[in-house]
């Protein structure tokens, strides 16, 4: 078997937004804060190509990280905000405050029967961070590297076209 592990996928066709939630959140002027966090984001189209190339060229028993760019949450939020034409978040908040907000949104979600805006698992992941190196996938699979700015632009265009955001 050949295994592929994509990082946070950003792009079109996120019909039930999961990773797209981050794009949608920072595309509105309602989110004035961010936490210190570094993660990796990759364009969904690059992930699709990576899956195909792993099936065609991948070595049996190997694992390939299908990744794009390592970025701080502050940088990501600024890219999304600039693309959406809104003000980026300005204040960094401590994890304790974010954890309390996560608990509150989970309680509210339970009462309303909806998905929590900020699950505690997400806050736990934020604190851990995620710096990834996809050199093997670049080298062996020739994984495309679409710029994160383009992935965000395409995601926002798709979300707007399908009325997820203004």
Label each region the model flagged.
Residues 50-117, 134, 149-166:
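Mid/C-terminal beta-alpha module of Rossmann-like enzyme folds, strongest
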Residues 17-18, 35-55, 62:
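Substrate-positioning beta->alpha
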């Amino acid at each position: 078997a050949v295994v592929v592990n994509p990082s946070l996928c950003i792009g079109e066709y996120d019909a039930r937004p999961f990773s797209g939630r981050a794009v949608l959140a920072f595309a509105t002027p309602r989110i004035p804060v961010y936490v210190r966090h570094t993660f990796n984001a990759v364009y969904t189209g690059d992930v699709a190509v990576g899956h195909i190339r792993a099936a065609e060229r991948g070595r049996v028993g190997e694992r390939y990280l299908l990744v794009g760019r390592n970025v701080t949450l502050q940088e990501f939020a600024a890219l999304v905000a600039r693309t959406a034409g809104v003000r980026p978040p300005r204040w960094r908040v401590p994890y304790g405050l974010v954890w309390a907000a996560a608990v509150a949104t989970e309680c509210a979600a339970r009462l309303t029967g909806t998905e929590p805006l900020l699950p505690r698992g997400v806050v736990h992941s934020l604190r851990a961070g995620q710096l990834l190196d996809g050199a093997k996938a670049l080298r062996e699979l020739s994984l495309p590297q679409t710029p994160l700015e383009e992935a965000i632009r395409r995601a926002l265009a798709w979300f707007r076209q399908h009325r997820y955001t203004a």
